[in-house]
Amino acid sequence: MNIATTPVAPDQAPFRIGLGEVTGAVADLGVMVPLATALILVNGLDAGAVLVCAGLLVVATGLVFRVPFPVQPLKALTVVAVAQQLSPGVIHAAGLEIAAVLLLLSIRHVADVVARVFTKPVVRALQLGVGVLLVVTSIKLVLNPPEIFSGTPAAPWPWILMIVAFVGMVVAARTRHYWVALGVLALGAAATATSASPHVGGPSFSLPDLQIPAAGAFASAFFLLVVPQLPLTFGNAVVAVNDLAHEYLGAAAARVSPSRVCLSAGIGNTVSGLLGGMPMCHGAGGLTAHIRLGARSAGMNMLLGASLLLLGLFFTAQVVVILGMLPVWGLAAFLAYAGLRHAWLVSDLRGVDLVLAVVAGALGAWFANLAITAGLALLVVHGRRVISPRAGNLEA
């Protein structure tokens, strides 16, 4: 089975907007909406700042890379921050520290050199782990929907609707009739709005304020949030997303490199950390979600980024209500489909490399910590090369 899509021709319009860009834009919201909402509701981040900073980075990456490119919350960091109910200052300090590391890696192509350590089995192990976690997240969304999804029907309807929506995703992706996926989501949103009857209210313009974290926040941020996040960020949101961009998009992704991805995420997190947004990355799972649901140009970024900016600038007070109108079972279906396709990328490995990737990816997914995946895969791959140089030469 060919895991890659047909590469995008480099002479195609990089900013066109079609139905595939629309469905691709919403394909990764199953990750962004719950995580961003948790940071807003539990940790007290400003909703407008979160969406404005995310929208700016989404638009900027589209303009820079000229292909559909993902922007996601930093997952490991968000999970720890929410679980420990850390203050906005600590979260913003962590974003600035991660930005500093990524900017250092972008200097003189340091990231391109470091990326060579992440060989194909290591990257595939991370992709498998991310894919499994996406599927698990989709199941948890339906099993225990966040409170913002107020119009969710009683069981077993969410499971039935998720399965129907998942089949719709498969049909849409295989036939390239992306209106099927968009129609499923639109009908679900309409049904949710009808049953919940949310009060949205009118628009009001607001801009994020400059927020400088206190000096004492940086030490806590580094040990609690940055240390567990960095291996996953570099492995999945730098090396793996670069690998997938070239695999999925061919010559159209010529502007994408590990150093440029580090620079993009570094600048984005600097702005976000100073304006009160959330820490973000370019997760490889998000790229699979966008591509598999139809996005083929940076028009997807323009569409998604403009939508986030519109919400963040004019509907700050209503953000949670508006996002809660999306059908949780529809988002879960998008997430499950993207996760399965992302995990399936491991299928092009053979022999010992396949076993390594599956074991490392499965362990990371089991413990919900992909730093374990990265560490184990790196240790085994490069340990084999030290013990048996011949094995390393054959792999290379």
Short names for language-model regions:
Residues 31-38, 54-58, 75-80, 161-169, ...:
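Hydrophobic, membrane-inserted alpha-helices
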